[in-house]
Amino acid sequence: MISCWLCARKAGSLAVLVAIGLSTTLYSGLAQSETCALPSEHEGMTFPIEKVDPDWACRLYAIVDNYTTVGKVGPIRTGLPESLYHQLLDRPPLAAALINRLELGLYKSEARGSGRFWGNDGEGTAGIVQLVYQDRNSRIYYLEGSHDGRFLPHITGKAVVFLRMNPVKDTDGMEAMDSTMVSYARLDNRILSGVVTLLRPFIGGTIKRKLGKGVETVNRLSLLMRQQPDRVLFEVMNPPAFPDDEVAFVKQALERLSHSSDLIPSRTPSP
């Protein structure tokens, strides 16, 4: 949502500068090199790099070791229970479609294989997102794509996003998730890379805004699902209706959110 947001996530999914990477042959060669040692700690967070496929570890290392810009976003809170948050992360096309129907953004997403999605944030950034590793608290994504903007020319590049997720309770006692992301991006454009010192602050700021906006959009979606479930369901079933399995998923999600809200006692002001 990271889709969308990552899509947004996301979603966001989430929406970061990225692009056509090095060939598989080159990366396979790197996998055999002792210099391919992807670090496990990123901005104070430790990830289980030893569980990442060696070939993927080297593809990520090529970016992390030679990045154009690196940045941290978060923690950003999303008002969804842990299991539902993970389920939406696994469904970037559905999250993007909901965001569009509810007029929260212009995200688009399509599945392109197992753990692989195409995404477009409607604001000049588009590309492929590949899930490399996941567990209950962590995800690692590889991205490749392009960005066109008013102040930046057409640029392509690749990126690695380390996502850390922590279940929390909000101020009302509701289940929520805190998401923190560390992104490493590397430009492909040789001319831009030559003036990277001048561009780095602007590019880094753009990436952080894209990632942050993706997660914040998913949070806005979660608020609508809690506060206006009838509207969300109407948009899902309004022609052209979502596929039956997605309608069933949204109905179940809305019921779960409604039930969890009912379990929280209402606050009464002190006399």
Where are these regions (language model features)?
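Hydrophobic ligand-binding cavity/cleft-lining segments
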Residues: 31-113
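A mature extracytoplasmic/lumenal domain signature
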Residues: 89, 100-102, 121-123, 133-135, ...
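Short solvent-exposed beta->alpha transition segments
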Residues: 95-118, 238-254
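Glycine-rich portal/gate segments that line the openings of hydrophobic small-molecule binding cavities
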Residues: 108-160
